[in-house]
Amino acid sequence: MHPFTRKLSFGCAMLLPFAFSLSPVLNAQNTQDDGPPNVLVTQREYLKPGKGGMLHERSESAFVRAFANAKSNSHYFALDSLSGPTRSLFVMGYNNFADWEKDRASIINDKVLNAAVDHAAEMDGDLLSSYDSVAMMLRPDLSLNKGSINGTRYFEITTFVVKPGHRHDFDQLAHMYADAYKKVAPDTHWDCFEVMYGNPAPGFPSGATFVVINTMKSQAETDKGMADFEKFSKELGTSGMEKMEELTAASIETTGTNLFQINPRMSNPPQEWIDKEPAFWKVPPTSMTKETALKTANQ
């Protein structure tokens, strides 16, 4: 658990988790060699009770095969929830919003791929209770350091809704965290994104919204984060912690944190990811038998 997030668990007033090493993590369509994408698009599938696990993997395998057969340059990776509602996230990264538009057009204009995706979506829809998407923009000024997708297995995602008229307080709070962590835990990394389109999560109020994700190789990093937070508190001292609590109370309307795990079987990663971690990414998608496919289609 990242230090910012941990404050939520301890019931403190300070509600600002900040950690996200998206670097090549979300560079599926990003041409940058390093660093997070400028635009992050996430599609969320909320599953009906009992419709997750291998059943959902089999359904998603149709999408993976469709993109592979088309030799499409569209790439994404999947995350399965380990907390909160049962859901899967499908994550795509772009250099800009124009590239997002081009990627959508490439699918629509490929009649064979478009038909295969439509068919897969129809079958997959029987497993879903709802579906939505959100598009976000990178905020480098609220981010710290860079990480790597290599070895990453978990995503800790935190959403913040900022009170109207208090964006400056939120920015100040984020910078205070960054300045302190540079001193006590210089290996700390995070990337922050601001929501441009869509709601961050069902039930969240509207307003300026920021999404922060901590990528982890293992959950042992949660334990390390707790130790780092003790150093962080000592660095700030009583007056610094009080100032942070004031800024938190002034700027944050609501926040929530959830944990997700990468699912390579439902992912369509770029080749460079596979080359670096073939044992993890190069796994066959869960196949759907003809009997299962017919059963799903007829539900």
Give residue ranges: language-model regions.
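Short S/T/G/P-rich N-terminal loop/turn motif that feeds into the first structured element of a domain
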Residues: 27-299
